[in-house]
A protein has these predicted regions:
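Structural signature of Gram-negative outer-membrane beta-barrels, strongest in the C-terminal barrel
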Residues: 1-105, 197, 245
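Membrane-embedded beta-strand positions of outer-membrane beta-barrel proteins
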Residues: 4, 15, 46, 60, ...
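Gram-negative outer-membrane beta-barrel transporters
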Residues: 7-10, 22, 125-220, 243-249, ...
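Membrane-embedded beta-barrel scaffold of Gram-negative outer-membrane proteins
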Residues: 10, 51, 57-61, 77-146, ...
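Outer-membrane beta-barrel translocator domains and adjoining extracellular loop/strand segments
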Residues: 25-32, 69-76, 108-116, 160-173, ...
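Outer-membrane beta-barrel "beta-signal"
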Residues: 86, 138, 273-287
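Predominantly the C-terminal beta-signal and adjacent terminal strand-loop region
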Residues: 257-279
């Protein structure tokens, strides 16, 4: 890959390209057949940052995405054009960013896993044109309570929308019959995390909440509860860490404090729950 950067005043522009030559081969030991496939692709990208002030900047970019189909596959390559536009703030102990994103897929690939019972593992399927868009928000802030004690907080949230742009019948079990405008499965609308930490010289006490909205497990546009779906959930975790030395630390965690129970997936073999309330101890050594 290669990147060229140009700077004019408070604006920086990066123009890049990545080139890949892919040689693939698949052997069928039952039939003795060997299939070879050669692919070459160049993916360009362009991004820019505009420093509005010492604390505020605006950034954006356009990037070509690519995921090759396997050498023995009848599926087309996965290709996409990805856009982002955002604003970033940083001042002393505060950092924040807001980013909008949009991914325009010319073709989406679905890949059969070993756990999928109605397709051959490794087989690939065309999903046609797909659009995925959303907004990401992040916020970090720290307050010095004393020379040796601080309070740190963070918040991260992602909102995502998705839809198929064509109607088709697929042998991929996660898709099946897809109608134009259907939302994609396994892309939750809302995902987030909130974290609060009390930090001393050699110790840290932290509480965090991970949350996720209900999630489709089959394509559709009707009420999500009218079809196969996973539950929404909010899980509280607590942890305490103590540094014995610069490299060695001990940590105790109470995960899923409230013992929240939720079905997180119905595939591959029926409903699966999240982790129940658990106590975990760790010894960490950093090299």
């Amino acid at each position: 890959y290669a990147i060229v950067r140009a700077t004019l005043g408070s604006v920086s522009l990066d123009v890049g390209a990545r080139h890949e030559d892919i040689e693939g081969e698949v052997q069928n030991y039952i039939t003795g057949e060997t299939v070879e496939r050669s692919q070459s692709l160049t993916s360009p990208s362009v991004s820019a940052i505009w420093e509005l002030s010492d604390t505020m900047s605006v950034f954006g970019g356009v990037y070509e995405g690519f995921s090759p189909a396997g050498p023995g596959s009848d599926a087309s390559n996965e290709e996409s054009t990805n856009y982002e536009l955002g604003v970033r703030f940083s001042h002393e102990a505060t950092e924040a960013s807001l980013v909008g994103f949009f991914s325009d897929y010319g073709n989406l690939i679905g890949r059969c896993r070993v756990s999928d019972t109605t397709c051959e593992p490794g087989s690939e399927f065309n999903g046609g044109e797909v659009e995925i868009s959303g907004v990401e928000l992040s916020l970090n802030h720290a307050i010095a309570l004393s020379d040796t004690l601080s309070l740190e907080g963070s918040l991260a949230y992602t909102y995502t929308e998705s839809e198929f742009a064509t109607t088709f019948l697929s042998g991929f079990p996660q898709w099946g019959l897809v109608k134009e405008g259907d939302e994609l499965p396994y892309i939750p609308e809302s995902v987030g995390n909130a974290r609060l930490s009390l930090v001393g010289d050699r110790w840290r006490i932290e509480g965090s909440v991970d949350f996720q909205s209900q999630m489709r497990e089959v394509p559709g546009v009707a009420d999500i509860e009218d079809a196969l779906h996973s539950d929404g959930f909010a899980v509280l975790d607590l942890s305490a860490t103590y540094a014995l030395t610069k490299n060695l630390s001990l940590q105790a965690s109470l995960l899923n404090v409230t013992d929240e129970a939720a079905v997180v997936s119905h595939r591959p073999f029926g409903a699966r729950p999240n982790r129940p309330r658990s106590v975990v101890g760790r010894i960490r050594y950093a090299f």
